[in-house]
């Protein structure tokens, strides 16, 4: 984010355990590549996604460390907060940035959530092994990220 271009930016950085994210993005990337090729190696895709996401998260942490003056304009939110109580999470975000939440807005959020229940479109399961990934490698690669943002490890389930 270029704060010089967007001086009034308010950032919500969401966090989820990479052991749940990496197989998902590897599956998405694998599927996208299949559109243009019949020769896609899922294990290669898995290694690439692990490398890309480790690099991106490390760069993000380095940027935040280098610019502590920006921290007041960044709110960290866990995926667990979002899923467990979406309305409270949105209210937390708005309160952090001193934005109003009207009763109508709150009501519309509840209406939307009632009309679109969790897992409305099914549940996706991804395998680390299908992408040549091992739980220990992910735990090692993302240890610093988990510690910095207090990301609770989610047990891997195939």
Model regions: which residues?
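C-terminal, active-site-flanking charged/polar segments
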Residues: 11, 17, 97-101
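Short beta->alpha linker loops
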Residues: 16-17, 81
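ATP-dependent NMP and nucleoside kinases share a basic, alpha-helical "lid"
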Residues: 1-15
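PAPS-dependent sulfotransferases, especially Golgi type II membrane carbohydrate sulfotransferases
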Residues: 5, 22-158
């Amino acid at each position: 984010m270029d704060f010089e271009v967007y001086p009034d930016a308010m950032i919500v950085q969401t966090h989820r355990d990479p052991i749940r994210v990496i197989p998902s993005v590897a599956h998405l990337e694998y599927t996208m590549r299949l559109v243009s090729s019949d020769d896609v190696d899922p294990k290669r895709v898995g290694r690439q996604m692990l490398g890309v996401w480790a690099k991106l998260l490390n760069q993000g942490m380095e940027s935040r460390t280098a610019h502590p003056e920006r921290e007041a304009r960044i709110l960290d939110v866990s995926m667990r907060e979002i899923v467990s109580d979406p309305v409270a999470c949105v209210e937390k975000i708005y309160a952090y940035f001193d934005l109003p939440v009207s009763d109508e807005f709150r009501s519309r959020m509840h209406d939307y959530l009632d009309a679109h229940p969790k897992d409305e479109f099914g549940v996706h399961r991804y395998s680390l092994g299908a992408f040549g990934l091992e739980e220990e490698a992910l735990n090692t690669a993302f240890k610093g990220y988990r510690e910095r943002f207090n990301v609770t490890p989610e047990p891997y389930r195939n």
